[in-house]
Structures are given as C-alpha cells and as structure tokens.
C-alpha cells in the first residue's frame, strides 16, 4: 500500500496496512537527525526562501537531505511549498528580518514578532490605512515551483499537503499585539473584525491560486491557527464563532470543492470546539496536545473518533523530552492500543520537536512505530 492510500484510508476511518506516520520539527532538529543518521547527499540543491507557518521568512539549505530523512523515518506525508521570490527582504544586524504583512521577526526556531505595526490602531480607518498592498502581493511566491512539488510528491505516492498555512488569528495578534487584539475583540469588535478580514482575505486568495495549481495532485489542506492554551480556550467559544469560524468555513468550503481533506493544527485545550470543527467539515485534528486540559487521546477517540481523525499525540511536554527510550516505546504502544482501532489515527508529535528532545528518543519513536504499527498485529501489543 502506498502512503497516499494508507493516509486516506485511515482518514476515512478504515484500517490500512499500518498506522501512518508524520513528523513536525524545527529545522535545527531536522538537521540534527540528518547528522544522527549520517545522511549524505552528493550535491545539495540551491537554497530557497520559504515563509514558515508563522510568517517568518527562512532559508532552507538542506532540502534533499531532509527528504532522505523523511524516507528513513517512513513518513507518509510531504509538504509542497511556494518559495518567496518577491523583493529582497531587509535583514537586520541582530539576524531578524522583515516578514509577511511587514512584521519584523526574529528569535529562536519559528521567530517572533518584534514589532506590532498596528498596535496603536483604534478605528477601522487605522486598519484600512495600513499599506496592505505592499505586503500582501500574491505574485511574490513561486506557484510553479509549488505545482512541481505537488506533481513530484504525488507521483512518488505520498499524501501531499498543500495550500497556505493560513493562521488567521495569529496574524491579527502579531499585527496589533496580542494584548491589544484580545481587548479589541470586546471593546472594538468592528476594528478586530476588519483586521481579521484582512488577514483572512490574503490567505483565501492565496489558497485559490495554490488549490488550482495543485488540483488533482494534493490530498490534504493542512492549515494552522491556535485557539487553545494549556487550561482551556484562548477566548470564549462565542468569540471564536463570531470572529474566526466564518473564515475557517470559507476556506474549508473552498478546499472541499477541490476534494481535499481538511486538517487543522490548533494547539492547547480545544476539546470544546471539536463539535464545531466537525460541523464545518474538519477531517483531521492536529496536534492533540496531551498535557492540555481535556485532551486525553483515548477519551477524544471514544467521544469523537467516528467523526474525525486524530494526528499527533506523542507527548512533547513530558515523555519525549524527559523520558527514556523505553518510556517512549511504551507510549507508542499505548497510542496504538487506544487510538488505532478502526483507523482514524496518525502518529506524530503533539507539538514541533524542539532541540531539548534527545535524538535517541525521536529515533525510538519512529523505529518503534514502524516496526509495531502494522494491522492487525497492532492489537497484540
């Protein structure tokens, strides 16, 4: 069974030949794993600039080696990306650089917003006056390269992720500053709504281009927007339904028109929103942050497992960073025993793998999952 068949079958709540595997990790960890497995390439391709999930523009230098690493770990998914090809972005002495929407970003791993250009915005006019056209030019991305990656990965039999990451609320917070934006949701809802419309419209228009370019070669629209924290939702369910749900629904309807599956990354405790996600057409929920309130994987499987698939759940807060290889192996077994019945489960970390996690634990997770994750033997663990 090829990876695409394996993934789509499990999303449809059927048992494939084995539990599908995926990975999410910062580039520093990917590079360390490349060295851990002594993966060599004769000639690395020319580096390209990519817009990361957070909008940080970063340079990917070891793309060929990363693809070989994915093969080594038996990863069933591949991402297709549209490299940034717009005007040269200013790089500052501290290593930070300008990113999407004109936000200066820098810092570890994903990068953080160092400035909030709409922090002082108080009116709709303030939002409209921002030079959106300068920072949201859809022609600044190489969609032909994106289409070629979709074609390549599709022909190789992988499940292909396509479309923009589309973190709608994330960007509104970075533009205005999280504190100001959260206050505006209550005190100036028309201003907050206008800002969210701006971020959503950019990603919707970009999605239309990417979906068309990847038509027939893309399997899953995987987007991310965080609505939870460790102990609950970031804002009330009513606020989420008013300000963000309509934009998700619009994007998901577009993706469904291309026959794509929908996968959402939303950190933290989001159990309260899962019924809404399902009603709006979500197929797969990621990353199942197991340490957050209400996110016990087997309980989610029991309550929602007939209607939605789960992606993630290998604990990056406790087991992977602080456990030993035997504890990692035990958690893989536990996930298989409690989550894989009837399909609907993809094993992956519960958040991005960071450099604090021992490489031996990461290797143990994937080696164990591949060795023992075959149906029907998975039930004998």
Regions found by a protein language model. Give the residues of each.
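Active-site loop segments of alpha/beta catalytic cores
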Residues: 1-44, 59, 98, 103-381
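Segments that shape or occlude catalytic/ligand-binding pockets
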Residues: 32-87
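N-terminal catalytic cores of secreted or lumenal carbohydrate-active enzymes
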Residues: 78-90, 96-99, 136-137, 151
